Swiss-Prot record, chain B:
Pathway linked to the protein: Protein modification; protein ubiquitination
InterPro entries (UniProt xref): UBQ-conjugat_E2_core, UBQ-conjugating_AS, UBQ-conjugating_enzyme/RWD
Gene Ontology terms: cellular component: cytosol; nucleus; perinuclear region of cytoplasm; UBC13-MMS2 complex
Function: Catalyzes the covalent attachment of ubiquitin to other proteins.
Record protein name field: Ubiquitin-conjugating enzyme E2 N
Length: 507, 151
């Protein structure tokens, strides 16, 4: 990534815009400049990943097969099945193969659902293949000459048209690729790709088959991941699997380990938990628990939206009178101003405490959720900003500015989006974080980045005229440099915490 | 309706010529893909003495996909639910086009002899089968007497 603006005059330029009065408290947490970890780059360049097209993936697959075959010297289709069995981990395959080569070869091939290629054809197979009279196909019950029949090394033979139909059904209807087994009942020997291609004449089915085996290659290979962006057909290949920021040729940036949008500083597992939490209705039920009670008589769920504690159930068949506080019948409360004599009973107190706890955990969740969603929505708007910024840049070039001079605007939007995204995920991180001294520094960093980001966003929405142009440019540049720097500081701090175990989690 | 594939015609013929003991499958007069099936409860099983009615249908892409089979007679069995649906591997992912109506019905008969409560379809039945097999077997006998024995 480019880091051409790492000039460090950001600190003093910032004091310039404090005077513009939009960020009140700027006693931010600069004390994060701790020793160590300065050498740690957030975007290290030593992570050499590649973006591959579908053709390149197929090519890559072939290279792996050839590489392994230099050592195994088996046929290509068999090597392919073996590799697929070992999830395309060639080291593991070779290790197992040479480990077990003497006495357990049989077992090795059996596990991979291949007939041992070193076996001599069994008597049965030989007999069947050398037979000259007609055979009955066990699928269509037709009597056919031997040249219309075929089968795998396992010796189960069916007619060509049944094979064709069988394979087509498996590929098209069931979406199977590398894992289609022999058509005989109970036989788990796999059909290799060359045989499939030979037996299936339909070009469309062949294409589908190719897609399926390429897909399973990418899916089970730990060093490959499809770009999760809609309609993108690229895959990313990495030197080792880790949560890293990868940038697809289509423009999408994502985390290699989990496939979500790049989510630094929060870790994959917390983000996964968070997304699940946001997706399922667990919070809906929390809300119901926190805000409603059940009628003690008919159990209908009631939300109390005001009024006194004398409840009359609205269920027409029930109409029960009860006290909202103790859930007891209203009668003993008497006609005097409500005075719930059971209010302090242990049971009632426990129920109240439980409800209180749910309520506060809901409030806590909503606090983080709202901020998370807010940045996510803003980020969507910022994407629109690119279009308007492009227009602005053209206008400015008409005002006698050169192309290079107006590039700062695009850069500003880039940084704005980057900051929004980071901020968004800081709320997920913070949600699971237990409070301690470091978490408070983190929150200060977060607050500071957030207010700077909002200011930058505001600047970018202002109209730019030829009069204020120079001024705006200065302000925008100062601000984005500041934002960028604060973002780096925040991430560095969190990473340092990961390295030195500062962070405690709530779950 | 498209003409009946050779496979189905042949299979039906053979089924009629060489019937399997304890199993009877007759195609419907109006639909050659629909079979009226009768399976007798295997000896030494709680279903002994019972006569179970089933229906069997060969879908359009048979034999590439498995026949659809369902018990019509009520039966107390951990792998058969209230609607008579059967949990059996060869009717699902272990189906092979080289299997036939005959082999499938034999598998079903075998399932009656060897219920598998670890892979249940009827959860309550399977549960009882595991915690109190004697009582489950008693229930199965009762149901057999009640629903599968004609007076």
């Amino acid at each position: 990534m480019d880091s051409d603006n790492d000039q460090d005059f950001c600190d003093n330029v910032d004091s310039g815009n404090v005077s513009s009065g939009d960020d009140g408290d700027d006693d931010f947490a600069m004390e994060v400049d701790m020793p160590s970890s300065t050498e740690r780059q957030l975007e290290t360049d030593d992570y050499q990943y590649k973006v591959l097209t579908t053709d390149e993936i197929v090519q890559h697959q072939r290279e792996i097969i050839d590489e392994v075959n230099l050592l195994l010297k088996l046929s290509t289709p068999i090597t392919r099945i073996l590799l697929n069995h070992f999830k395309w981990d060639k080291e593991k395959l070779l290790e197992k193969y040479f480990d077990e080569s003497d006495d357990n070869t049989e077992e090795f091939f059996k596990c991979a659902h291949v007939i041992n290629p070193f076996n001599k054809p069994t008597e049965a197979v030989r007999q069947r293949t050398t037979r000259s009279q007609c055979e009955e196909c066990e699928i269509c019950f037709s009597l056919l000459p031997p040249d219309s029949m075929t089968g795998l090394e396992c010796g189960h033979r069916f007619c060509l048209s049944c094979w064709r139909e069988y394979l087509t059904t498996k590929i098209v209807t069931e979406g199977l690729g590398q894992t289609i087994s022999c058509a005989a009942h109970g036989c788990d020997i796999l059909v290799d790709d060359v045989t499939v291609t030979k037996l299936v004449p339909d070009a469309r089915v062949k294409v589908k088959y190719q897609q399926l085996i390429t897909n399973s290659f990418v899916e089970c290979n730990q060093l490959l991941r499809w770009c999760p962006s809609v309609d993108c057909t690229y895959a990313v290949k990495v030197p080792y699997a880790e949560p890293r920021r990868v940038h697809c040729k289509c423009g999408h940036v994502f985390c290699f380990a989990c496939g979500e949008n790049w989510h630094d500083p929060v870790k994959c597992r917390w983000l996964k938990k968070w997304i699940k939490k946001c997706d399922d209705d667990s919070e809906t039920s929390n809300w119901i628990a926190a805000n409603t009670k059940e009628c003690p008589k008919c159990s209908v769920t009631i939300e109390k939206d005001g009024g006194c504690n004398h409840m009359v159930c609205k269920n027409q068949n029930c109409k029960h009178d009860f006290c909202w506080v103790c859930l007891g019948s209203w009668e003993p409360h008497g006609s005097s101003w409500y005075n719930c004599n059971r209010y302090d009973e242990d049971e009632a107190k426990a129920a109240r405490d439980a409800q209180e706890k749910l309520r506060s955990s809901l409030a806590r969740y909503l606090h983080y959720y709202n901020r998370y969603m807010n940045h996510m929505l803003s980020m969507k708007f910022e994407n629109k900003l690119y279009a308007s910024v492009k227009q602005k840049m053209e206008e400015m070039q008409q005002h006698n500015m050169s192309w290079i001079e107006v590039q700062f605007l695009k850069k500003a939007v880039d940084i704005l989006c980057q900051c929004r995204q980071t901020l968004m995920y800081t709320y997920v991180f913070a949600y699971y974080l237990k409070k301690n001294n470091q978490s408070m520094i983190f929150e200060d960093n977060q607050k500071d980045l957030e207010s700077a980001t909002e200011t930058l966003s505001e600047y970018l929405e202002r109209d730019i005229t030829s009069e204020n142009l120079a001024d705006i440019k200065q302000k925008v540049q100062d601000k984005y440099r500041y934002c960028e720097k604060r973002c780096t500081v925040l991430l560095k701090h969190v990473h340092e915490g990961y390295d030195t175990d500062w962070w405690d989690y709530t779950e | 309706m498209s003409s009946l594939p050779r496979r189905i015609i042949k299979e039906t013929q053979r089924l009629m010529q060489e019937p399997v003991p304890g199993i009877n499958a007759i195609p419907d007069e109006n639909n050659a893909r629909y079979f009226h099936v009768i399976v007798t409860g295997p000896n030494d099983s709680p279903f002994e003495g019972g006569v179970f009615k089933l229906e069997l249908f060969l879908p359009e892409d048979y034999p590439m996909s498995a026949p659809k089979v369902r018990f019509i007679t009520k039966i107390y069995h951990p792998n058969i639910d209230r609607l008579g649906r059967i949990c059996l591997d060869v009717l699902k992912d272990k189906w092979s086009p080289a299997l036939q109506i005959r082999t499938i019905l034999l598998s079903i008969q075998a399932l009656l002899s060897a219920p598998n409560p670890d892979d249940p379809l009827a959860n309550d039945v399977a549960e009882l089968w595991k915690v109190n097999e004697a009582e489950a077997i008693r229930n199965a006998r009762e149901w057999t007497q009640k629903y599968a024995v004609e007076d």
